[in-house]
Each structure stands twice: as C-alpha cells, then as structure tokens.
Amino acid sequence: MDFQVRRIQVWTGEVPDRPGAAAAKLEVLAHAGIDLEFVFTRPHPRKPDIGMIFLAPISGPEQIQAARSVELAPALDVAMLCVTGENHAGIGYEIMSRLAIAGVNLRGLSVSAVGHQFAAYLAFDNPDNATMALQVLTH
C-alpha cells in the first residue's frame, strides 16, 4: 500500500445553526485566497442551535488573520493526518486494520474518493497517537 501521509492543522469555530452562517465564514476565507481541502460540520455537543465547523489548511499571516476575523482558531484538542493515494476497494479497511493491529485508536475518520484517488482524514485525541499512526501507515 502506497500512502502519502501528512499532518494537518485543523481550525475550528462555532457556527449558528441557520442558513448562510457557514457560508458567511467561508466567504471571508475565500476572499483571503484560502484553498480549503477539508471542511466538516457537526452539531455542537453542548449548545443547541450551534454547530461546529472544522477546516484546513490555513497558513501564513494573511490567512490566519482572515480565519481569526471570523472567530476560527486552531483546534487544540485534536491532531489530524491526511492520507492520500490510489483508491481501490477496501482502502478504508486497510487503513483501519493497520491502525487496529498497532493499537492506535481514532477519534474520527472521513474518507472520500474522486476518480482513482482517495483522501482520508484521520483525527486523534493527541499528537502522540497521530505520530504513531503516521509511522504505522508509512512503514
């Protein structure tokens, strides 16, 4: 299995659960030239009518300033890897089984395929687990 694996810094923030709220944040980022490769939303676990948005990458002073202007910040409680490569049947199983055999637990997983390529975003509770997963998937 040939995977390309890299760490990514995820940014996050709250979004009111109403039409256009996420689009307003994304508009500011688009005008700043931010080319997002990962965007994920979910309900806030403790606040009704609020959602959470997670996105990456954001880098450089201008992009960071734009993200902060819409109340986004680096996610400090999650470490994430992006795994990419040639897609085939069972790719999710291959990734998950290699991590399971090594005893690495995931916090979250998102896998998508377009054409013959896949991208998997693996979330971990801490940087040590992400480092262990990186080693498992690249050796």
Stretches found by the model and what they are:
Residues 1-139:
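A conserved regulatory-domain signal marking ACT and ACT-like small-molecule sensing domains
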